[in-house]
A protein has these predicted regions:
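Acidic, glycine-rich low-complexity/disordered segments
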Residues: 383-401
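Secretory targeting and sorting signals
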Residues: 1-37
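Glycine-rich phosphate/diphosphate-binding loops and the adjacent beta-loop-alpha structural elements
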Residues: 398-417
Length: 609
């Protein structure tokens, strides 16, 4: 699919023939004025209908997703978005930070009497030290100040289990760490977390509220929140213990009917599952190849099956930016949006509500992703929040761990083999190679566990090239315990093939490997055949299917997480230190102020294109 730039679109996009289609789909009848580059479906913040008691009322829906506790502007490429230039080429621009997100959202709300703010999950979990050190209490506090109205849960809301998620909702001090601010009890979220497809195994009852109805002056919009059904495959077993995750489509359709029976006909689904547009530019017109043709991935199949009773889908999980239409089961285009990640974008959508039918008019759309640029004034309340928590974290966060010669990209790398992935895998292998530490011969690291880059430019007063504890924690925030297990060569080979088959067939997960472990990935082939037979070697020798190897990996992978059941077959397990501890130990052992760690060559996986 061609990545065709379409910017500053000023023509109205008609979503349905005829003005009477009001029971399905999303959004706006008013023609807004053209906005800045990146505005889509008429773009901008324009609203044209009666803001009072008239029949048609424009409701502003502001949305975002996958914040992951990034209160401060993300560093390096993790803090950038791609956009089209006038000549059709692309450029990267800095974005993100809740001080700026708050300003942008507050400015966007001005002049909009009816405005609701919603999110699609993963707002907490896998967070940088500033939030993660305090079990994400700082992020929930920031979201309260952002006036978030409602969010779905995502998979990362379950990182610390259902009990901790309940604490995020209801408040209270941490059961082991206690209260972080002396004499002040954590109040919890002012907004509801929705988890319609998450039930308790023993009772079958919903873990949290399945839906929420926003209401103002008689205007009512229902929100249904779900996370991906595959959450147990990408969260530790302890995190989802005692829970059942249901089918997204079946769940949304079930509660859409319930809302309809309650007289709520305007419905938005908050879905923590996503897709991938044909271009990584946030202002790409993903409908340019045809409605629904410029985006692929799990969300497209979900959107095609969700009941026409649902008027729009706000999505997440894949950290991608898109504002698309995907045909609903009746063949009518319906809006599907996602706002990248880490607070770098927000989506502004207009929903035109008909007071007589109580439904959303789907004759036209006005929706756009907007960059959370850093050229606006910082929100003072967010600055104070960050300063207060930074002061508490400083004694730990500012400790030097090592030195780097240049940026070492992890999350910001689009390659299968990431330079920072090599460093992490080497750290895990080296830390667990001694006989008394496990005798590891190689290490495997899941790419999703690499949450950021190591950036050479100083983030504070530590000096360029210094890696602080706060920065290493941001890269490895889960503090998973390391495991060393016996794996047969056959199961090791099977695990590599599972990178590109089975649960990972449509969204590959390429394991990062330690030095000495090599193989070839042929992307011209399909499924498991992409891992070339006979190419898998350890220190130049072909892996013997009948032989046993000692393999280091984090406990999540050792449990078969991320779609790697072959890794769960390991035996003779030894539990070592945390992944963060071995990472920091490696940085300390392999770098100094005069001899910083160089960027690895990333030449262990040969890719055939």
């Amino acid at each position: 699919m061609a990545a065709t730039p379409r910017k500053n679109r000023t023509a109205r996009r008609l979503l349905a023939a005829g003005a009477g289609l009001v029971t399905v789909g999303a959004l706006v009848a008013a023609m807004p004025s053209a906005g800045a580059a990146g505005d889509r479906f008429g773009g901008g913040h324009g609203h044209g209908h009666d803001e009072g008691k008239g029949r048609l009322v424009d409701v502003q829906l502001l949305s975002f997703n996958d914040l992951h506790g990034n209160l401060e502007p993300p560093a390096g490429s993790s803090g950038q978005v791609t956009r089209f230039k006038a000549d059709g080429t692309t450029e990267k621009v800095d974005a993100g930070g809740v001080e700026y997100l708050a300003t942008h959202l507050r400015q966007a709300r001005k002049g909009n009497r009816y405005s609701v703010t919603a999110a699609a999950g993963d707002l907490i979990g896998a967070s940088p030290l500033l939030s993660g050190l305090f079990h994400d209490e700082p992020t929930v506090g920031a979201l309260n100040k952002l006036d978030l109205d409602v969010t779905s849960v995502g998979n990362h809301e379950f990182d610390e289990g259902a009990v901790e998620l309940a604490r995020m909702q209801n408040g209270g001090c941490h059961p082991t760490a206690g209260c972080f601010v002396k004499g002040k009890k954590f109040k919890g979220a002012d907004f509801p977390y929705l988890a319609a497809n998450v039930t308790k195994e023993k009772t079958g009852k919903p873990l949290l509220d399945p839906y929420f109805v926003w209401e103002k002056d008689g205007v009512r919009i229902g929100f249904i929140g779900v996370t991906l059904e595959g959450t147990p495959n990408i969260v530790t077993a302890e995190g989802v213990k005692g829970l059942k995750f249901g089918d997204e489509v079946e769940t949304i359709n079930k509660y859409a009917k319930i809302l309809e029976r309650k007289g709520v006909k305007s419905i938005v689904a908050l879905v923590h599952e996503g897709g991938a547009p044909a271009s990584d530019a946030y202002d790409y017109d993903c409908d340019s190849p045809g409605p629904g043709d410029g985006i692929s991935g799990p969300i497209t199949e979900i959107a095609k099956k969700v009941s026409p009773q649902v008027d729009a889908l706000v999505t997440g999980h894949t950290h991608q930016a898109y504002v698309c239409t995907v045909p609903d089961p009746a063949g009518k285009p319906r809006l599907v949006t996602s706002a990248s990640s880490y607070g770098k974008l927000y989506t502004d959508t207009t929903l035109t509500y008909d007071r007589r039918t109580k439904d959303i008019v789907r004759t036209a759309v006005a929706s756009a992703n907007h960059v959370v640029s850093r050229d606006v004034p910082k929100a003072a309340d967010m600055t104070k929040l960050i300063q207060d928590w930074t002061a508490l974290a400083a004694p730990i966060a500012n400790r030097p761990q090592g030195w780097i010669a240049a940026d070492i990209n992890g999350r910001g790398s689009t390659a299968y083999e990431k330079p920072l992935g090599d460093v992490i895998a080497d750290a895990q292998w080296e830390g667990l190679a001694p006989a008394d530490k496990g005798g590891a011969q190689l290490a495997l690291m899941n790419p999703g566990g690499i949450r950021s880059d190591l950036v050479h430019k100083a983030s504070g007063a530590e000096g360029d090239g210094v890696v602080t504890y706060g920065e290493s924690f941001t890269v490895q925030p889960f503090t998973n315990m390391m495991n060393v297990v016996d794996l047969t060569g056959a199961n090791l080979i099977a695990a590599l093939k599972q990178q590109v088959s089975g649960a990972n067939l449509n969204s590959v997960k390429i394991l990062q490997v330690s030095k000495g472990f090599t193989y070839t990935l042929d992307t011209t082939k399909t499924g498991a055949d992409r891992v070339v037979d006979g190419s898998i070697k350890l220190n130049g020798e072909a892996i013997d299917p009948a032989k046993t190897y000692r393999v280091a990996m984090n406990e999540f992978l050792a449990g078969g997480g991320d779609g790697f059941p072959a890794l769960a077959t390991g035996t003779n397990k030894l539990v070592g230190p945390s992944d963060l501890d071995v990472f920091n130990a490696y940085l300390a052992a392999h770098s100094s102020a005069t001899s910083p760690l160089a960027v690895p060559a990333a030449d262990r996986i040969t890719v055939v294109k």
